[in-house]
From Swiss-Prot:
Catalyzes the last two steps in the biosynthesis of 5-methylaminomethyl-2-thiouridine (mnm(5)s(2)U) at the wobble position (U34) in tRNA. Catalyzes the FAD-dependent demodification of cmnm(5)s(2)U34 to nm(5)s(2)U34, followed by the transfer of a methyl group from S-adenosyl-L-methionine to nm(5)s(2)U34, to form mnm(5)s(2)U34. GO terms for cellular component: cytoplasm. Residues 262-654 are annotated as: FAD-dependent cmnm(5)s(2)U34 oxidoreductase. Residues 1-236 are annotated as: tRNA (mnm(5)s(2)U34)-methyltransferase. The gene is mnmC. The keyword NAD does not apply. HAMAP family: MnmC. It is found in: Cytoplasm. This is tRNA 5-methylaminomethyl-2-thiouridine biosynthesis bifunctional protein MnmC. In the N-terminal section; belongs to the methyltransferase superfamily. tRNA (mnm(5)s(2)U34)-methyltransferase family. In the C-terminal section; belongs to the DAO family. The lineage of its organism: Bacteria, Pseudomonadati, Pseudomonadota, Gammaproteobacteria, Pseudomonadales. It comes from Pseudomonas putida (strain ATCC 47054 / DSM 6125 / CFBP 8728 / NCIMB 11950 / KT2440). It catalyses: 5-aminomethyl-2-thiouridine(34) in tRNA + S-adenosyl-L-methionine = 5-methylaminomethyl-2-thiouridine(34) in tRNA + S-adenosyl-L-homocysteine + H(+).
């Protein structure tokens, strides 16, 4: 999957319209753009009627080729507001190869002041838009936008969704022949179902014939303005073939929209918020006296992207998760709860410098770029041993603030001092027990207690491990406040928050004791010396008594492949029996439904990346539960799936 972002190259004509240099065409007609959208895409698909008929909590999914300036999205959102039930939802999925940068997007959408109620919320969240899947939430989750940034023929095959309405847009076939291909139409068919409708402005004969061959019944209809005719259609072809059963969608839970989430850290609060935004009543059971008391409780966590130049599943998830988290943080108070101060990763040896050079060549400079020592020092505000890789959109977060913000939804009920020891399934309801006390029950449960999920029998075989980490809190001084960005080497140090710098973090694979130790404080101070001797002097580290230093320790929870474990849970024994043939031939795909433990999900194993991966994983869990488009590429969702470990055991004969 390509990693390099290519923004749209825009010129502006004398009427103020954006013009694409790449396609040598305007994005929309000067006086008729909105009316064309309403006629071709909203009218021909009878979208107002569809919205009006939506039941409470039902969701219409619109798919689009070519997001461009977002006009079709804004018009669809406006129509949804006008006609849909207040509890209905809209999920808009759009592919864009060359996204507009923020300045161009702002200039374009302000041509439509009548749509400001819809364009301004997008502009507020239009940050960290990088290649791959980028999800946005609006109006408390009632409207979701998933942008697929990249080539349509690379992105759509990775989409796991059922589309109800297609907006077949993008520049005209003559201007954009690489998009209008049989491969595209085959993907439209794969993602459609009987009843899916389609609107498009083009009436080109070969496009119509190709859509018919793909399974759409197409017809020409009167156009508008200079477009004499346009086309509309409906999918009448067969359903797509099933995927591998171990990654198939579980049946959507019917009945009351009630869920339990066990654990109120980042993974738990994110899962609860994502479900609550979809109309679920969520009870969160937390064993401590408040949320974010374990690994999510550090005063400052770093928004740091440890990427690969090769587009691995982990790298793709980090890019998508980083964008999603950054957009969620816009709702918090900057300076107190988080800060986009940037993150500088020092090139502390030749191997690291080589790695950074490869990353800088693979990614957009807006995401990361190399700095020489003088440039790095100018940004950091302190003397450094060398240059490094700078992430201008990164920064630090106070994780408890993010957890608390997510738990404030009126559909969430947090119950503290409740330690769940056992789960039982009785009459399609999961019951949470503590000894002989029934704590709560619901048809859906999300286990989000880091490595503590292993105490529950359905998760006992998940290969999670705990790694102890300790941070040190250093009182800021007048001169240490010069530090303006997070700086990392083997450890990290953040600019001050409420009068303290956070310094960390140790890695201990053996200790089970959470009491902070003097030895690890000393180890963290040694990490600070590697980052900046100047900053250590500004903090008067030599005068500090390690015995008096404050800090906290917690357990990171990680998996062997460093990807989180997110998704539905299957019965381990029945799974091994159903797919035992894989031990003899890994190419087999038995026609046996996966033995899901209906309504049971997990969100764990985020390691030291929880700020980046846990919030989007909450959306992934909710998409599984509700049968919505997944917010990550299929291959990435499968790489995070709990069943991956059962498959590996079968194939390896263990």
């Amino acid at each position: 999957m390509p990693t390099l972002l290519q923004h749209a190259q825009i010129d502006w004509d004398d009427q103020g319209r954006p013009h694409s240099r790449h396609y040598d065409d305007v994005y929309f007609a000067v006086n008729e753009g909105i009316e064309e959208t309403k006629h071709v895409f909203l009218g021909q698909t009878r979208l107002a009627e569809r919205f009006a008929n939506l039941a409470p909590h039902a969701c219409t999914v619109i798919g689009e080729t070519g997001f461009g300036t977002g006009m079709n999205f804004f018009c669809a959102w406006q129509l949804f507001d006008q006609h849909a039930h207040s509890d209905a939802r809209l999920h808009f999925v759009s592919v864009e190869k060359y996204p507009l940068d923020h300045a161009d997007m702002a200039r374009a959408v302000r041509l439509w002041p009548e749509l400001a109620a819809y364009t301004e919320p997008l502009l507020e969240q239009y940050v960290a838009v990088h290649p791959g899947f980028q999800q946005f939430t609006f109006t408390g989750g009632r409207v979701t936008l998933t942008l697929l940034i990249g080539d349509v023929l690379e992105q759509l095959p990775q989409l796991d969704a059922q589309i109800d309405v297609w907006f077949l847009d993008g520049f005209a076939p003559a201007k954009n022949p690489d998009m209008w291909t049989p491969e595209l139409f085959a993907q439209l068919a794969r993602l459609s179902h009987p009843g899916t409708v389609l609107g498009t402005f083009t009436t080109t004969g070969w496009v119509r014939r190709s859509l018919v061959e793909a399974g759409f019944a197409m017809k020409k209809v009167p156009g508008i303005g200079k477009k004499w005719e346009v086309m509309s259609g409906a999918y009448v072809g067969p359903l797509p073939g099933p995927c591998a059963p171990w990654y198939a969608r579980p049946a959507v839970t019917q009945g009351p929209r009630e869920a339990l989430v066990i654990g109120a850290g980042l993974a738990g609060s994110s899962s609860a918020a994502s479900l609550a935004r979809r109309g679920w009543q969520v009870t969160v059971l937390e064993r401590h006296e408040a949320p974010a008391q374990e690994a999510s409780g550090n005063p400052q966590g770093v928004l740091y992207l440890k990427l690969s130049a090769h587009g691995t599943a982990l790298s793709q998830m980090i890019l998508s998760g980083f964008g999603y988290t950054r957009r969620q943080l816009q709702r918090l108070q900057r300076g107190r709860d988080w800060d986009a101060c940037g993150v500088l990763q020092l090139a502390f040896d030749s191997k690291e410098a080589e790695r950074q050079g490869k990353l800088a060549a693979a990614f957009d400079p807006g995401l990361l770029h190399c700095l020489a020592r003088a440039e790095a020092e100018a940004i950091a505000g302190v003397a450094l041993p060398g240059g490094g890789l700078f992430y201008p959109e990164g920064g630090w977060v106070h994780p408890p603030a993010l957890c608390q913000q997510q738990l404030q939804h009126p559909g969430i009920h947090l119950v503290t001092h409740q330690e769940v020891l056992e789960l039982r399934k009785v009459d399609e309801q999961w019951q949470a027990w503590a000894g002989d006390q029934l704590l709560a029950r619901a048809p859906v449960v999300v286990l989000a207690g880091a490595a503590d999920v292993l105490r529950f029998e359905p998760c006992a075989q998940l290969p999670l491990k705990r790694i102890r980490g300790q941070i040190t809190r250093l009182p800021a001084t007048v001169s240490s406040q010069a530090l303006r960005t997070v700086v990392c080497a083997e450890g990290y140090v953040a600019p001050p928050r409420e009068g303290e710098h956070t310094l960390g973090a140790s890695f201990d694979f053996h200790s089970e004791d959470l009491a902070p130790t003097v030895a690890e404080h000393q180890g963290n101070l040694a990490l600070l010396d590697e980052i900046s001797v100047d900053l250590a002097q500004r903090l008067a580290v030599a005068e500090l008594d390690p015995e008096q230093l404050q800090g906290r320790a917690a357990f990171r929870c990680t998996s062997p492949d460093y990807l989180p474990i997110v998704g539905p849970i299957a019965d381990a024994q029945a799974f091994a029996e159903a797919y035992a043939v894989l031990g003899r031939d890994a190419r087999q795909v038995p026609d046996v439904p996966c033995p899901w433990l209906g309504g049971l999900y997990v969100n764990s194993g985020h390691g030291s990346r929880g700020l980046i991966t846990a919030p989007l994983s909450g959306e992934l869990v909710a998409a599984w539960v509700c049968g919505e488009p997944l917010p990550l590429p299929r291959a990435v969702a499968q790489a995070c799936h709990p069943n991956r470990f059962g498959l590996r055991r079968l194939i390896r004969g263990k």
